[in-house]
Regions:
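Divalent metal-cofactor coordination and adjacent catalytic microenvironments
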Residues: 1-91
């Protein structure tokens, strides 16, 4: 995910908290790999990765304002699907 894409997801202008947003973007691939087993190299091929990345980014960025229960349930469901998809890559 690029900084521009992240700013669009978060509905913020570039230049506002760019360092924070970039650090969250940088954390996404390894977080997804750790929680699902889907290697970073395989994440590019999975459309759900972009969706769950946007949701995670929203949850992390707006931690004190996000509707945590509904958003967390959605994120957890998508991470479970990606875990199943990771098994296809891992054999």
């Amino acid at each position: 995910m690029t900084l521009t894409e992240a700013c669009n997801v978060l509905h913020v202008d570039e230049g506002n908290n760019d360092e924070l947003i970039q650090s969250l973007i940088d954390a996404l691939p390894s977080y997804i790999a750790t929680t699902t087993g889907l290697a970073e190299v395989n994440q590019v091929a999975e459309p759900l990765v972009k969706t769950v990345s946007g949701l995670l980014l929203t949850q992390w960025y707006y931690a004190d304002h996000a509707d945590d229960q509904a958003l967390s349930r959605t994120i957890n469901s998508l991470l479970k699907v990606l875990t199943v998809r990771a098994r296809a890559y891992n054999g």
